[in-house]
C-alpha cells in the first residue's frame, strides 16, 4: 500500500522536475541572448583589454568609447555564466575568468577561432531564416541577408574569412595525430587536398614519417584562400617543403583537378548537397591515377535522442551552405551513385568529430 507521505514525495518530485523543465526550455528560448552577448564582448575585444588585470567599466568604456552603464550590464550578464568575473567588493570592476581567458588567444591554430566564427553577427542572424530554409528546402541564411552564398560573405568580411579558415586549421591540428596513426601516406607519390585551406593537413603529412616518400603535395582551394596563404607567407612564414604547392581554383569550374594517386577532402562534402558531392566525385574519377585512393574526412552521424554536436552543425549546413551531415547509410547511398566504391569506413576512436571513408574506383 502506498502511503500519503509517498504520494506527497512523488508529487513534490514531479513539481520540481516540471520547474526544471520549464527553466530549461526558457534557457533554450533565450539562448540567442548569450550568443549575442558573447559576440558583442568579442567585437570589443574585452578579454584582450582585461589581460591579466582587473579593470573598471568606466576605464573600459573610455577606451572603447561606449556607454559605461550598458557595458556594465553586458559584462554582468556574461559573468553569470562564467565569462568574466565581477569583483565581489567593488561594483563594476571585472577581470578575466578561466573561460574568458581562453578567448584571448585567436592565433591561426587556435580552436577559439570557432567561437569567434559561431558568434559572428551574420552567422547568428542566418538562423533567423531557419524556418524559411525548412519551408523551401534550400539555404536561406545568406541569401536573406543579401549574399549569394557564405563564400561571398567570407570574401567581403576578411576577419570572418580568417576565423573560418583558422577554424579548419585548428580542426586539422586536433586530428592529424590520429589520422597519421591509421593512414600511411608513403604508399602514394602525389596527394591533392581539395579544399585544403591553409594546407595544414598536407604540411603535417609532409613533416611526418608517414609522408616522407610522397613526391608531391598540392593544396587546392579558392583564389580567396590561396591568395591569403600567399600574404601569410609574405608576412613571415618560412618557406615550406619544396614538394608542396598550391592551386587556386574552384571545385565546380570546368577545368580538371590536378592529377594524383591520392585525394583528401576534410570537412568538404558536408557543405554540399548530394548532387554537388557527386559532381566532385565524378571530377576526381577523371583525374585520379590508376589504383588511386580518396580519403573523405567527415562526420558520420550516429546517436539518436542524445546530445551530439554534429546535429547542430547539420542545421548550420542547411541554413548557410545547402549541405548536410550524413549517416552511414546516407554516405553509402551517395557512393553507390558515384564512380567510387567504399573500401573502408573508419570511425576514429580518439576523434571528437571525424570519421574516415576510404574510396577507390569501381572496376
From Swiss-Prot:
E.C. number(s) listed in UniProt: 2.1.1.-
Keywords per UniProt: Differentiation, Methyltransferase, S-adenosyl-L-methionine, Sporulation, Transferase
GO biological process: biosynthetic process; culmination involved in sorocarp development; DIF-1 biosynthetic process; methylation; programmed cell death involved in cell development; regulation of cell differentiation; sorocarp morphogenesis; sorocarp stalk cell differentiation
Cross-referenced SUPFAM superfamilies: S-adenosyl-L-methionine-dependent methyltransferases, Winged helix' DNA-binding domain
Domain of life of the native organism: Eukaryota
Pfam family name, one: Dimerisation
Catalytic residue list: 270
GO molecular function annotations of the record: 3,5-dichloro-THPH methyl transferase activity; O-methyltransferase activity; protein dimerization activity; S-adenosylmethionine-dependent methyltransferase activity
pH-linked activity: Optimum pH is 6.5-7.5.
Induction of the gene: By cyclic-AMP; this induction is inhibited by DIF-1.
Residues the entry annotates as binding S-adenosyl-L-methionine: 195, 221, 250-251, 266
Catalysed reactions listed for this entry: (3,5-dichloro-2,4,6-trihydroxyphenyl)hexan-1-one + S-adenosyl-L-methionine = 1-(3,5-dichloro-2,6-dihydroxy-4-methoxyphenyl)hexan-1-one + S-adenosyl-L-homocysteine + H(+)
Functional note: O-methyltransferase; part of the gene cluster that mediates the biosynthesis of DIF-1 (Differentiation Inducing Factor-1), a signal molecule involved in the differentiation of pstO (prestalk-O) cells. The three-step process begins with the formation of (2,4,6-trihydroxyphenyl)-1-hexan-1-one (THPH) by the polyketide synthase StlB. THPH is then dichlorinated by the flavin-dependent halogenase ChlA. The last step of DIF-1 biosynthesis is the O-methylation of dichloro-THPH (or des-methyl-DIF-1) by the methyltransferase DmtA to yield DIF-1.
Family: Belongs to the class I-like SAM-binding methyltransferase superfamily. Cation-independent O-methyltransferase family. COMT subfamily.
Protein name: Des-methyl DIF-1 methyltransferase A
Annotated organism of origin: Dictyostelium discoideum (Social amoeba)
Amino acid at each position: 500500500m502506498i502511503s500519503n507521505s509517498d504520494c506527497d514525495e512523488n508529487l513534490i518530485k514531479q513539481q520540481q522536475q516540471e520547474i526544471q523543465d520549464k527553466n530549461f526550455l526558457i534557457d533554450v528560448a533565450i539562448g540567442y541572448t548569450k550568443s549575442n552577448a558573447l559576440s558583442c564582448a568579442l567585437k570589443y575585444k574585452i578579454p584582450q583589454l582585461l589581460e591579466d588585470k582587473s579593470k573598471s567599466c568606466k576605464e573600459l568604456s573610455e577606451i572603447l568609447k561606449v556607454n559605461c552603464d550598458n557595458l556594465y550590464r553586458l559584462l554582468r550578464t556574461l559573468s553569470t555564466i562564467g565569462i568574466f568575473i565581477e569583483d565581489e567588493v567593488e561594483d563594476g570592476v571585472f577581470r578575466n575568468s578561466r573561460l574568458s581567458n581562453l578567448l584571448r588567444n585567436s592565433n591561426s591554430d587556435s580552436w577559439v577561432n570557432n567561437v569567434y566564427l559561431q558568434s559572428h553577427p551574420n552567422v547568428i542572424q542566418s538562423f533567423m531564416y531557419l524556418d524559411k530554409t525548412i519551408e523551401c528546402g534550400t539555404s536561406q541564411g545568406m541569401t536573406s541577408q543579401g549574399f549569394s552564398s557564405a563564400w561571398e560573405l567570407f570574401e567581403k568580411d576578411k576577419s570572418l574569412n580568417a576565423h573560418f579558415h583558422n577554424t579548419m586549421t585548428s580542426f586539422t591540428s586536433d586530428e592529424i595525430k590520429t589520422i597519421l596513426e591509421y593512414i600511411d601516406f608513403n604508399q602514394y607519390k602525389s596527394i591533392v587536398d581539395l579544399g585544403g585551406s591553409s594546407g595544414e593537413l598536407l604540411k603535417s603529412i609532409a613533416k611526418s614519417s608517414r609522408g616522407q616518400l610522397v613526391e608531391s603535395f598540392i593544396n587546392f582551394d579558392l583564389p580567396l584562400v590561396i591568395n591569403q596563404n600567399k600574404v601569410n607567407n609574405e608576412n613571415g612564414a618560412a618557406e615550406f617543403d619544396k614538394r608542396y604547392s598550391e592551386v587556386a581554383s574552384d571545385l565546380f569550374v570546368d577545368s580538371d583537378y590536378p592529377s594524383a594517386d591520392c585525394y583528401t577532402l576534410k570537412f568538404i562534402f558536408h557543405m554540399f548537397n548530394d548532387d554537388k558531392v557527386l559532381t566532385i566525385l565524378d571530377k576526381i574519377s577523371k583525374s585520379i591515377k590508376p589504383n588511386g585512393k580518396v580519403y573523405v574526412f567527415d562526420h558520420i552521424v550516429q546517436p539518436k535522442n542524445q546530445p551530439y554536436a554534429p546535429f547542430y552543425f547539420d542545421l548550420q549546413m542547411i541554413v548557410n551552405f545547402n549541405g548536410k551531415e550524413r549517416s552511414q547509410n546516407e554516405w553509402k547511398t551517395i557512393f553507390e551513385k558515384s564512380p567510387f566504391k567504399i573500401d573502408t569506413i573508419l570511425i576514429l576512436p580518439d576523434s571528437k568529430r571525424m570519421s574516415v571513408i576510404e574510396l577507390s574506383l569501381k572496376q
